[in-house]
Amino acid sequence: LICTAKQQVPVGQGEMFFELENDPMAIPPIIEQLMSDLAHRGWDDELAQMRLSLALQEALSNALYHGNLEVSSSMMTESTDPFYQLAERRRLVQPYSNRMIQLVAKHENERVLYIIEDQGPGFDFTKLPDPTHEENIERFNGRGLFLIRNVMDEVTFHAPGNRIQMVMHKPPSLDDPDYLQGLVA
């Protein structure tokens, strides 16, 4: 397996920088490495790791497909084939082929911070449709960002809409006597 991601580590204590090409196969190994690093830092809560993995998968996929490759989710109707076929064609041609995704990961004791930036034109994050409204239930657009907002503690978009910052605070441990005392009180 050829991983099309460049890594420069460490930037600082608990900080990593990745630069990914427009290859969806580069995403899972990066997420796996980040989750492994978190586990070594005591973030062994499986639910938290699952939530973080989901948010990272969605954010990196959005940066790849909607950001760098500029493929609209409106192309997903009954079939996703046209969406992925266009993405595959664009991966190989200018200006899309030279665009990169940058990921900064800061793993701290009590929180994690991820900043993901693509080189696409961005989008108007203030006009995202609510995927839970009845008229949007069967549409694909907005679902990934909805998931990200619901699994992360803080989500911030930066103009022009090609950069997302996500934060999760470390969940309390069931082994923590102070946390257990709070449950009993």
Model-found features: residue ranges?
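Receiver (REC) domain switch/output surface
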Residues: 1-7
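Conserved beta-strand-loop-beta-strand hairpin that lines the nucleotide-binding pocket
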Residues: 9-15, 64-185
